Amino acid sequence: LLVLALGAGAWYMWQYHWRTLSIEVDGTAYSAKADTTVAAFMRDHRDFERKPGRLLSVEGKVLEPSGGNTVSVKFDGKQIEPADWDHTRFEKNGTLTVTPGTDLTEEHTVEQRKVPFKTDINLNGGPVQIVTQQGEDGLQEFWVGRQSKKTAAKTVIRKQEPLIVKSFAPRPEGKKVIALTFDDGPSIYSDKILDILKQNKVKATFFELGEQSLEFPKVEQRIVREGHQIASHSVSHPYFPNMSAQEQRQEIESSLSDIKKASDVSTRTFRAPYGAFGVDEWKNNATLIDRNVLWDVDTLDWKRPGEKQITKEVVDYVHNGAVVLMHSGGGDRSQTVKALPEIIKQLKKKGYSFVTIDELCKMAGL
């Protein structure tokens, strides 16, 4: 019995402790006792020069050179987790596959944030500024690192669409047309202007102030009835660059509402007071209007230079597609009223016909 016990003990020690195994790594055979743990084997061979991965911030910067995933070990294709290395022994000959650790990104929170739309606004091409594409905010995923406290932009969920505004100088091919426009009305002079236009079978565009529209609703209704175009010139003629975005929007929204109430016309055509409407104003208000119409022939009638000078400014500088600025309100417009018949007469003599802003844009394919 003693001999059997000693023999069994010797066999056990040989089988599980003294026996030499052949462990192949990277094509090279290494010897290891049967009681060698994976941890000891890796330590004895310096992890076969494999390194753990790095711990990276959400921005991809190294926070800890060895803070990433540990070296990966497989024995005959079976994964051995790092937590099991200390109590996993080799029981047979085999192949150990050792893979460097992979990088690990720090723990982080994931947020979805609005990405404000960009702008592509060119206001140097002519007097008619048109929205060709509305801006739309994008949506993007952002990671906020718990260790680094940094924020990194990641997956784009919805791409932002830029606000595109282009400006044009309408020149209808094969035509000789002109757009007469009147600002600051309606007023006590509006009916006189409308009488002249009617007598001469001429159409025009009226950029009206909301507060004036409410005061003269019958004039607004006559403008529409006789085939002219009504558009907005704000409520009270403020200087937009000095206003907050909220104030600007309120001014335009109120003017559109006033015009609708007085004339039953819904318009998205606008002329900024003083022509002061730049990139910031477009960014603030592009969802309210489709066009901002300036001018390229200015009569300067608001200075009251005399009816002959007002007429001369138009006749001397007229061209196909011209947008002429005149005033039907905002002060004494008697000179404008007196000049208008002669302006129409001379322009007709030159072969011009008269159109509204809507008609001009349509003729020019805008």
Question: Which residues fall in each region the model found?
Answer:
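Ser/Thr/Pro/Gly-rich low-complexity linker/stalk segments immediately outside membranes or between
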Residues: M13-Y30
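LysM (lysin motif) carbohydrate-binding repeats in extracellular/periplasmic proteins that recognize
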Residues: A34, A39-T70, K74-D76
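Catalytic domains of cell-wall/extracellular-matrix polysaccharide-remodeling enzymes
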Residues: E215, P238-S353, D358-L366
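Short, recurring structural edge motifs at helix starts
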Residues: D26-A32, V58-E59, P82-W85
